[in-house]
């Protein structure tokens, strides 16, 4: 009996230790198709490798939050880190700047990654 109690306590301690591991998100911003000015496309922000799961992600046009942004369900990898895809339809042109802003407990403040149309 005491052995099973000890194993249960050990299991709970090891599970609670999983929450202590914090991982910084990797942020990738890209379009679904090669960009052509004036042609509709999709802007994607793939955020991966982060832990814990609480995260804020915004797609930006000229520094302002874009509307009608959708996202995938929160998923996790084999290493128990999380990943998400945020996306929205947009029409690229030469004058507008697009970016993805992410805020997570592992960051000192929000991190913004600009979309590079040449990627």
From Swiss-Prot:
SMART domains: IGc1. It is found in: Secreted. GO terms for cellular component: cytosol; external side of plasma membrane; extracellular region; Golgi apparatus; HFE-transferrin receptor complex; late endosome membrane; lysosomal membrane; MHC class I peptide loading complex. Disulfide bonds join 45-100. It comes from the Eukaryota. Residues 25-114 form the Ig-like C1-type domain. Residues 1-20 form the signal peptide. GO terms for biological process: amyloid fibril formation; antigen processing and presentation of endogenous peptide antigen via MHC class I; antigen processing and presentation of exogenous peptide antigen via MHC class II; antigen processing and presentation of exogenous protein antigen via MHC class Ib, TAP-dependent; cellular response to iron(III) ion; cellular response to nicotine; intracellular iron ion homeostasis; iron ion transport. GO terms for molecular function: MHC class II protein complex binding; peptide antigen binding; protein homodimerization activity; structural molecule activity. Keywords: Disulfide bond, Immunity, Immunoglobulin domain, MHC I, Secreted, Signal. Heterodimer of an alpha chain and a beta chain. Beta-2-microglobulin is the beta-chain of major histocompatibility complex class I molecules. Component of the class I major histocompatibility complex (MHC). Involved in the presentation of peptide antigens to the immune system. PANTHER family: BETA-2-MICROGLOBULIN (PTHR19944:SF62), MHC CLASS II-RELATED (PTHR19944). Belongs to the beta-2-microglobulin family. This is Beta-2-microglobulin. The gene is B2M.
